[in-house]
Amino acid sequence: MRILQRALTFEDVLMVPRKSSVLPKDVSLKSRLTKNIRLNIPFISAAMDTVTEHKTAIAMARLGGIGIVHKNMDIQTQVKEITKVKKSESGVINDPIFIHAHRTLADAKVITDNYKISGVPVVDDKGLLIGILTNRDVRFETDLSKKVGDVMTKMPLVTAHVGISLDEASDLMHKHKIEKLPIVDKDNVLKGLITIKDIQKRIEYPEANKDDFGRLRVGAAIGVGQLDRAEMLVKAGVDALVLDSAHGHSANILHTLEEIKKSLVVDVIVGNVVTKEATSDLISAGADAIKVGIGPGSICTTRIVAGVGMPQVSAIDNCVEVASKFDIPVIADGGIRYSGDVAKALALGASSVMIGSLLAGTEESPGDFMIYQGRQYKSYRGMGSIGAMTKGSSDRYFQEGVASEKLVPEGIEGRVPYRGKVSDMIFQLVGGVRSSMGYQGAKNILELYQNAEFVEITSAGLKESHVHGVDITKEAPNYYG
């Protein structure tokens, strides 16, 4: 029998407090998603079909993190989810949605409803701006067969030149009391659009995680051999791809990673792995970040069904030891129950954490809402559950094409308590991490990693750590018992 090491998880260890002059409110939580993409907070929503679609991804990016849209949908639907995130707000919309004057109001309604926008520029066949159709133009129109050109606000319009700053645009929009400012070139060809909503959101969400064009960042999951899906997602503007597998240290994953890096210019996160060798091989194949975790998730049964995995603290430690030599970020995926677990993962060297169950219960998650015994819940399932595998994630567990009655699941379906908005949950998690860094005297995540010291605790120590000897009469928003 070969016992490689004693393996620990989050509840097995505690960090030792250090002398500190650092206040929690003063720490920086800026980190990295990949070697090229920054995060303003080290939180990622999981690529699960009950956790992340466009609503969760938008909420995460506005707060400074990022969401990874799951792949249990056809390519076109996943591309639409990415597009909704990228179109949700922008400093300057460089490829604005537009409509032609000969289209009907019914056509315009489809566009505005689909993209959740209140107006759309109108152009001719040469792309010249000839008007704008807004809510005010159509509010009292009952005949949707009318042509857009008959109802729109026609030229001359207040427009701006290419290269105008957001501050200049804001002044211009306030001066003329308009909500949309088309950007045109010297020939009056539509080149962009600035909306007052985007300017207001820049003030409301100062830490929003945005790309170079002022759009919210978003990632998307893909499977083995899905190069066509990857290409379409990159064209849609996805910021990072997550090559997602229950066993990231496999020949098919390595081959797919190499093919993507050869053919596309995009950062690729690869996982899941738990060993030094796997981390080294994925980095050699071109991985821009390593996702760590086999079996730590609350809905995952891989360790029980397959007898395979590694407790998450030791897994993170293994992978960071190798990845840090190449300056490749590590993402701790799974096993996070409390904000203290996040702090421990970061102190071990992870650059960010991926969260599933804590976000599955939020308003923005795509899971079903339900009431059970008078309490509110949302559905949550593992991507290795029968339900998720029949919807498209069977390839993640190397069972693609297997009949549903022959699937061997590595996850379950369940429910989690309803927890309000994503922002409420992230607020508590961020606050807990800030508190931890204050105890550690760490001004930033790098200092936390460099200086943190751990002790291994006993089962009695764990019992002492939790609430004990008292009945909770009022639940705390960050402690779940």
From Swiss-Prot:
Its job: Catalyzes the conversion of inosine 5'-phosphate (IMP) to xanthosine 5'-phosphate (XMP), the first committed and rate-limiting step in the de novo synthesis of guanine nucleotides, and therefore plays an important role in the regulation of cell growth.
Domain CBS: 92-148, 152-209
InterPro entries: Aldolase_TIM, CBS_dom, CBS_dom_sf, IMP_DH, IMP_DH/GMP_Rdtase_CS, IMP_DH_GMPRt
Family, similarity comment: Belongs to the IMPDH/GMPR family.
Keyword entries, A-Z: CBS domain, GMP biosynthesis, Metal-binding, NAD, Oxidoreductase, Potassium, Purine biosynthesis, Repeat
Catalytic residue list: 300, 396
Name by which UniProt lists this protein: Inosine-5'-monophosphate dehydrogenase
Organism phylogeny: Bacteria, Pseudomonadati, Campylobacterota, Epsilonproteobacteria, Campylobacterales
